[in-house]
Amino acid sequence: MNHHPTGTPVPPRRGYAGRGGGRDFYVSAPPEWRATTAQLCGLWPFAAGSGTPMVGVPVGRDIRTGATVCSDPVNWFRRAGLIANPSMVVLGIPGVGKSKLVGRIATGLASQGVDPIIPGDLKPDHADMTLALGGRVVQLGRGQGCLNVLDPGAAMAAAQRLTGDARRRLIADSLGRRLTMVSALVALNRRAVVTDVEEALIAAALTVLDEKFPPGRATLVELVGVLEAGPEPVRRLTLDRGDDERYRAAVHGLQSSIGALLQGAMGDSFAHTTTTPMVLDGPLDVDISGIGASDEKLQAAVMLACWGEAFGAIAAAQALADAGLERQRLFFIVLDELWRVLRAGPGLVDRVDALTRLNRQEGVGMAMVFHTLKDLVSLGTEEDRTKAKGFAERAGYLAIAGVPAAELALLQEVVSLSGPEGALITSWADPPSWDTEQQRELEPPGRGRFLFKIGGRPGIPVQMTLVGPELGIHDTNKKWHG
């Protein structure tokens, strides 16, 4: 029998055996309450800290302890210092709540003055949320507007307000982004990489167009016209030595590829001036749900163009802020279904990386959404596969929902998972049970559940539950309702 320090016997936790001993077969757990440190500070030694992050957007509760968990890439980087890069990757099979998690984070950040930008919303998952936050929704697709990839957008308007090196840097950045976009669209459409000479020809032609046309007026039609005319800055790169036939042979492939972009659905989307410019005066969603899932090439092209325009507008806004001409702003950008663009053609990993590589000083948090890492390692070349995995490796942290068991080996190459963590996330991928009485499926075991992983640190298993207005604005199955 144990004894108290004073020598008094301490009864067993179930009481003494025998008559009058108070023996019980069940000992109930003590009741628990949660409150702030200020409220519970006088209850020592009965209070215990939860140990979960309390900085950022409240996303749910720790599955093990019930403690509140706060998480978002902006606050975890900016205020908590938990991650080295303000970005996150969300992984999980369809139907587990990836879009709802991103929507919860976007809504919370919007309340803190961080503008959510969704440049390429396929279903759309976030249009209702954007409207509820007072933002704007731009529609693109077949018969729903055009996006001119040669339009410098906000960059030229911002450059006119700048001087010196700041002006030159922004103009050079705008030229580089347009060059990347045209090269990416050509590579995507021809399903072959753009050569270094072709890229130099595009850059020279863009410079000629900038000198001849007001910002936003030149389109891919005029770009083909410059290649056809062959002005000296362009002709010089072909080493034609005054031979017109040699020049025609040198530009024929590129001219044909850009000309192909002007035909059919591609032409409807990219051959004219921009219908609705992206104005970053608040939350923004670009709804491209009008493009059918069967038109994968057009879908990937429009997504890529939207990303390019959005990142260009962000760069212009930050350049004005750095010069003291506008207030400093923070953005949260969501790249959903990223794999659709990466697998659309060889070399597009580099193009996407060039468009999205914003450093920590530019005030941009980012969420990249995949189904599984197999989306990245199923690309055509080993070089592309290696570079694509870098998107997950460089992310500040991962939010892992239910994934198949076959995914664990790939995940282990990116982040350290313990045995119990691996078992947990694979159990979330199990199919739902069947309610024989109601004749319907029960909720899937992994819905709303995520494991937050930062490098080799122990993961935080979180259960997210939608509340109040979220139930309506984050409903991704609207078309199935009667």
What are the language-model segments listed below?
Residues N75-F77, G81-V96, G103-A106, G292-W428, ...:
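Conserved P-loop NTPase motor cores
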Residues W44-R64, L131-L133, A155-V364, R440-P444, ...:
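P-loop NTPase motor domains
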Residues D165-A218, G380-G482:
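P-loop NTPase motor core of the ASCE superfamily
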Residues V137-Q139, P283-D285, L398-I400:
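Conserved beta-strand scaffold positions in the cores of enzyme catalytic domains, especially
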Residues M1-V89, H481-G482:
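Basic- and hydrophobic-enriched, low-structure N-terminal and domain-boundary segments
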